[in-house]
Structures are given as C-alpha cells and as structure tokens.
Amino acid sequence: MKKISRKEYVSMYGPTTGDKVRLGDTDLILEVEHDCTTYGEEIKFGGGKTIRDGMGQTNSPSSHELDLVITNALIVDYTGIYKADIGIKNGKIHGIGKAGNKDLQDGVCNRLCVGPATEALAAEGLIVTAGGIDTHIHFISPQQIPTAFASGITTMIGGGTGPADGTNATTITPGRWNLKEMLRASEEYAMNLGYLGKGNVSFEPALIDQLEAGAIGFKIHEDWGSTPSAINHALNIADKYDVQVAIHTDTLNEAGCVEDTLEAIAGRTIHTFHTEGAGGGHAPDVIKMAGEFNILPASTNPTIPFTKNTEAEHMDMLMCHHLDKNIKEDVEFADSRIRPQTIAAEDKLHDMGIFSITSSDSQAMGRVGEVITRTWQTADKNKKEFGRLPEEKGDNDNFRIKRYISKYTINPAITHGISEYVGSVEVGKYADLVLWSPAFFGIKPNMIIKGGFIALSQMGDANASIPTPQPVYYREMFGHHGKAKFDTNITFVSQVAYENGIKHELGLQRVVLPVKNCRNITKKDLKFNDVTAHIEVNPETYKVKVDGNEVTSHAADKLSLAQLYNLF
C-alpha cells in the first residue's frame, strides 16, 4: 500500500489518531483519541474521490442506506474525542464509524451504507459537536431563537409569554392558556422548545393543570415567592408526574435561609439556576447548594468567566427585575446579590466539576447567543490560571474539554429528561449537529444541522457563481422553511400531556415528545461534572471554602474568543 506523510493525510482527510488540534485562539489542545476509519479505505466526496458509483457508493440499497453521510468528522463529545463518519437516516443518527460500500471496502459498519439515496457532507478538517441546550430562557422576544441558533444552540428550555414584566424577570409560562399559545407559537421555529409552568403554587391541582397543558416542569422564582411551601408542593407533583423543578431561591431570606430551602427540598432532585447568586438566590451563601448530591447546579453566562468588568455591569442588569435605581431598598436588594468573591469562586467550581451546567438567562441578565462562547472562555481562563487538570492523561486537554462540553449538551439534557433524544453525538438521537472550523470553535459555527437537515450555514452571495464569495454570513437554509421544519424540530411536553394527546388537541404539526426520567437522577448522573463537596461562605468576607480550602480566581483582563473574532 502506498504511504503518505501525516501532513498530507491531514490535508486530505483531517486529523487522525494522535494528532492535536487547538480550539480557536484558546490554550485548549485536544488530541484525537482514535479513528474509526480503515486506512486506505476512507470515503471522500468530489471529483476523482471515492464516493462514486461502484466504489464507495454501493449499487445495492439496504435498510441501512443513509440519507446523509458526514465524512471524516472530528467528533467532540462527552463520549469521546475521535474521528468517524456520521450516518443520518430519517433525521436521526443512524450510525457512527466507518461508512462506505460494504461490498467492496473493508471495515464498513453495517449501519453506514452509502447508496444511491445518500447525500454527502464533507467534514474533513472540521469539528462536529451536538447542538447546545440552554435551560434558562426567558422567552421575552422571539428574536432570541435565531440568535441562539446561530451560536450553536438547538434546544431552548424556559418560560415566558413575551415582554411582560413577569417574563422579563422569571422563566415561567403560567397557566393553561399561556402554555397553549406558546406551544402554538413554537411551530414557527427551527429550534427544539420546552416550557416551564409556574411552580410558586401551594395548590396542587393548579400545578397538575399546567402539566396537563404541556409544561415540561416547574420554575420556582423568588419574584413570585420561593417559599418552603411552594418548593414542597412543586416537588411533590414533580415526583408524581416525573418532571423537573428549577429554582431561583430567596435572595432576601424572607421565607428562610439556604438551610431552610434545603430542608424543604428534602433530598429531592432540583435544578438550581445561577447557583453562584448574582442572578438571584439566598444572599450571600446560595453557592453552598452546589455541593449537594441532589442539586443539579447551573451558572448563567453574565458571571462566567470572571473578568474586570463583571461586577460593574451587574447593577444595571439587575434593574430588569422590575427594580428602580431611585429607590434605596431596590438598590440595596440588587447590591446584596453582587459579590466578587463568590463570582471568583464560580470559575474554579466549574473547573472542579462542582458546577455542572451553563446557560444564558436570556435578556434577563444573560446573553442568549453566548452560552457556548462563555463556556469555552471559562475553560481557557481556568487552564491559563490553574494549569492542567489532575485527571488529564497524556499531553492534551481532553478531560477538561469533555468536562466543559458536557455543561451545555448532555448534562442539561439529562436534567430535563430529554437525553434520550438530544444532547450528544450518539446513535439513535436526533441529528442536531454543529460543524465548526477549529480556528472558530466556540465562537462562530460553520453550519448547523437540525434533525438531519441543514438549517443554517455561512453562505456567500446568492448571485455569485460559487457559494463562497463575499459577503459571507449566516443565512437560513431549507431546513428553516416550509413544512420541513415540522419534521426536524421537537416540542417537549410532560408525559401526561403527551399521553392525553396534546399534539392533536392543539393541532401541532411539529414532532412532540415527552420528557422522562427527571426524578430518578442525582448529580452523580451528570457527566464529567458530578463532584459533591462541603461548601462554606464566610458571612462577612464572602470568601468561599470547599472542603475547608479557600477557592477563588483572578478577574481576567483579556479573554480568548473575543475581539479577535468580533467587531463589537
């Protein structure tokens, strides 16, 4: 067999086992763990290449003939960092491994048949990740959806009804009628969507009614009263109906302190929003909750990574919660939530795997298009400050990369009961995939595939003779249009709503699927971010200790994935 140099191989097929790739302009270096190909039998599309009739393409279609093959992709996922062909059929990932013509080529997987019906997408030199999942969405404006989508987010979970004051402050779609209208409005968008009902209710029939109306769970928010009674009732119904509860705890400690909230939770699983506290929650020590086994702790992106500007911008952001900067008590309320010491600790807690999820808090103290970027900026800042993680093996950052990608893919999927459908690059899941050039990883995707169909891509002038002439910018592709979007996007609902036929009741055309397995999980089920610990906060200095050791980080004055890539 003719041999070629590693440099030539990479230029033709992308990096292979042992090759290293830098992510964007960060210091994060991945190493390809293994390559599923058979060397010498690689498939590649194009003139003089191998995906041709009677070569890499078979003449004998089978039940495993693919609709789309993504060739030579570098997959970055909690399951591994490896090279493979990805086969898509009927909108789902049908196989991962070596694709081609089994009649002629060695090593072709049974489920990866390239045939007459197969389209090809070349991923040589590109990284493929699962679409991101943002679980802290205030549905204030529908314009958030394409903004998030263009950043690589393919699932949004939260609540709201538009720019009402309740939605500006809380991620809640309250009541049957509001849920009905939001579920109907969801039909329009290339995005998986799920809505949280109001959990601030001490009357269980009202909670059940929202689940029957299609809510995927409950949100408890201090602006509606995060009392022990509301917490207990919401969790009682969540346990009965297998849905998740998210909580923004009581900043003012009016109905109790953090210990009282933990007592009301009583060891039951709950998803804590902005667990550091600047976004809201028991002052000054809500961060203690992150160490508990039953707490699924999330950050929102204004506080990560910690920079020299973080503290200053938060006061203005806090006013969105229907506060008035001219009212002394409102200013004191806001000021109680902004603690540089706990914000500084948050970055380190992410690096330790104690904080498990990243999210946005869209237009309500967070930026909906920056979840992915902020996650990788935090990873890079922590590597620069703290060095390699002790869990790393070999001269790479693979463990840290898996830890951080899990924070916005598989872990939010597990938390909200949708990991059977989305959240990772695994066979059987919907093909919600994001393609990245390594130089732009984490900041500007090349292309987004939604339910197996291209929905958004960087695209040049439509009047040009080829696809690439300037101006190149994100443009909606066919997956965004017509009835195709009904087949390739999911509306998530509770199991009771699904079983009662809510799709037919509301005349929904999109795929409708139930959430499940929300109550039989703990933090130990979260990938690469399952660390529990005893966390303390000094009530006077706000310094944070983990298992007796102080944790903090420096405020960065420069970040990766920032001005190098953006004009504004």
Swiss-Prot record:
GO terms for biological process: urea catabolic process. The modification N6-carboxylysine is found at K219. SUPFAM superfamilies: Composite domain of metallo-dependent hydrolases, Metallo-dependent hydrolases. It is found in: Cytoplasm. It catalyses: urea + 2 H2O + H(+) = hydrogencarbonate + 2 NH4(+). Binds 2 nickel ions per subunit. One of its GO terms (molecular function) is urease activity. Carboxylation allows a single lysine to coordinate two nickel ions. GO terms for cellular component: cytoplasm. Its EC number is 3.5.1.5. The active site is at H321. Ni(2+) 1 binds at H136, H138, K219, D361. Belongs to the metallo-dependent hydrolases superfamily. Urease alpha subunit family. HAMAP family: Urease_alpha. This is Urease subunit beta.
